[in-house]
Amino acid sequence: MLVIDGERCLLGRQRHFAPGMYSALAGFLEPGETAEDAVRREVMEEARVKCAQVAYFASHPWPFPSSLMIGCFAQASDTDIVVDTVELEDARWFLRSEVAAMLAATHATGLSAPKPFAIVHHLLQAYVVKGASVLSG
């Protein structure tokens, strides 16, 4: 789930990630929960950021642990981050231009994003190309 605030998006990193790699936040649906509600809950749990609008982007099969990844965009309704340090090592807002550099492996400080085998790569790519208009489909 890629949380957007205009020209910025929220990315986080887990301790086991490759050095310098950031990704969109992620989580699992709970029984009886809609995908949209899961996005709002997971973002709130991991970064304490409230989300308003949620828009479905795509799905992608994921073999570990036999899951279906559901890619969504979400509009941030606040931007103050409080990181859940059990879930994440860090979370921060990145400019769209920074994300483009991360995808191209040209970020000034060597930060990177997941490769094309992961749905988050495609979420980030769509955001770089279309900006916040990805929320309108």
Model-found features: residue ranges?
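N-terminal strand-loop-strand
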Residues: M1-A24, F28-L29, K50-C51, A74-A76
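Surface-exposed, charge/polar-rich loops and edge strands
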Residues: E33
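Nudix hydrolase/Nudix homology domain
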Residues: A18-Y22, T85-G137
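Hydrophobic alpha-helical positions that pack around
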Residues: L25, V39, V43
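Active-site-adjacent beta-strand/loop module that shapes the phosphate/pyrophosphate-binding cleft
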Residues: H60-T85
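Short, well-structured beta-strand/strand-turn elements
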Residues: R48-F57
